Amino acid sequence: MAYFPLFVDLEGRQVLVVGGGKIAMRRVRTLLEFGCEITVVSPEVCEELREKVLWKKKRYDETDLESLGNVGEASRFIFVLAATAPEVNEKIVCDCRKKKIPVNNASNRDQC
């Protein structure tokens, strides 16, 4: 599969990160530089994440995508990052694709 680099203005956009470990922290650190509003969904998160994001202390389910708003509005581009167990990532990728939400699976380049 060939990948096309994409530049997106993320300032003020909602970003959902699923997972609260080291991979999620690296992604969040980078995204914060671009002015995103970040929500993390995970039963546990590293302490540094707690201070920088809105944390939903729970396991992911499909309603987490619905809570982000209407993805059809051009002004509310939503980019979802998945950084957890492979089976959870697979579900998130499927859920996002059904709803036409751009998704990046940090652990599987084929699902970007």
Please tell me what each predicted stretch does.
Residues 43-45, 60, 107-111:
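Short, ordered loop/turn segments at secondary-structure junctions
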Residues 61-75:
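Short amphipathic alpha-helix with an adjacent loop that forms part of the alpha/beta core around
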Residues 1-44, 48-51, 55-58:
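Hydrophobic, well-ordered beta-alpha structural blocks that scaffold small-molecule cofactor pockets
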